Amino acid sequence: MEKYVIRGGKPLVGDVNIGGAKNAAVAILPATILAGGKCLIENLPCISDVMASLQILSELGANIRMVSRSTYEIDTSHLDSTEVSNELSRQMRASYYFLGALLGRFGSGQVAMPGGCNLGPRPIDQHLKAFTAFGAEDSVEYGQIHVRSEHLVGGHVFFDTVSVGATMNAMLAAVLAEGTTILENVAREPHIVDLANFLNMMGADVHGAGTDVIKIHGVKEMHGCNYSIIPDHIEAGSYMVAAAITKGDITLHNVIPKHMEPITAKLRAVGCEVEEFDDALRITRTGELKPLKLKTMPHPGFPTDMQPLMTALLTLAKGTSIVTEGIWENRFRYVDELIHMGANIQVDGQVAVIEGVKELHPAPLRATDLRAGAAMVMAALAANGVSEVDETIHIERGYENIVEKLQALGADIRRVEIPANAVSRAI
C-alpha cells in the first residue's frame, strides 16, 4: 500500500494536461464487445478502473494490444466467455456495464455485485428494469447478477430515477435488439453523449443522447472503429479547485469548456477568475473566498463527484456555506477528516453547513473514496505543514498520474510505500 506525503502552503502554478474521461472509458471499453471486431480506443486514462476493464476484456477472450500509454487496440472477434470473474467485478462499480454489452451481443451475461466507492446504496434495479423491458430474464443469487434472453426486442423504458449507469447499460443492451427502444428520464452527462457517439461510430442508430429521451433503432450487426474519448471534466474540475484552494494560477489543456460550465460558474461565484479558450481554461485566485449555497444535481446541475472538492474549498471561505447532496446518501463520510484539519462543518443528513476558517492545519488523513480522497489531497495542499493521505488506492482509481501532475505545478507531494507490517498493525 501507498500513502501520499504532502507539504502544503504554497500556490500551485503552471499547466496541466487533462486525460480522458473515466466515466466514459469504463462504459466504452465494455461497448467494444458489441463490435465483434477491432476497435482502436485513444485518450484512455491510465487509471486502475481502466486497467481492470481491459483485464476483464482479456479474460473474456479479447485480444488487446497496447499501442501507446493512452491508446489500445481491442479485438473482440473471438470472445469465449460471458461471465466476468468475481475478483475483477468487485474491483470497480462500473463492471456492471459488461452485463449490457454481453447481453446485447450474446444474449447472456454474468457479473458479481460490483465494488468501487461506498457512497451508500447503489441499486441496479433500474438496469434490470431496462433489460426485462427488452425481454431478458434476470436473477440475483449469491452475489451474482445473471441476465439472459433468447431474443432481445426493443422496448419503452421510463426510469424511476435519473441514473447514469442504468442509462448507459440500457443503451449497450438495446443497440442490437430488434426494433425501436425509447428511454425516458435518462441521464444527460457528457459521457452519455460520448458513449452514444462511439456506438454510432460502430454502426448503431442512437439519437437524443444529451436530452432526457434517447431513441435507439436496433441494427443487425456492428463493426469496429477508431475513437478518441472526451476529456475528463471531473479531473479538470479537481485541478481548478487546486488552483482555487492554494491561491494559484493553473492553465488546463485538453478540456471542453462547455462541459465545465456548472463547475466554472461555482468557482467564479466563490471569487476565482476563469478564462476560457477553445480547448483550455485558466483559473486564478488572489482575493478571499466567498461562501455560497450549492446542491448537487444530475447534469446539467453541479456534479456530485465535485462535491467533496468544493466542500474542502469552502472550509476556507469567509462566512457560512451550505452544501446539499442531491444524488448519493452517504457522500459526507469524509467530513471528519476535514474536521481533523480544523474545519468547522456540521452535517445533518444530506446537508453540510460550513463555517469558514482562516486556515486548515496539517493532519493524518484517509481517502474514504475516490473523490473524497482527491478532496483530502487538495485540503493538504492548502495547509501549512506536512499531511499524510492514506488509502490512496481509491484516488488512483480515477486520477491519472496525480502526484506527477501536482509536482509539475509546484506541489511538494510524494508517494511513500507503507510497509506490510505497518498495514497489518493498522488493520
Label every model-predicted segment.
Residues 1-427:
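Short, structured segments at the rim of ligand-binding sites
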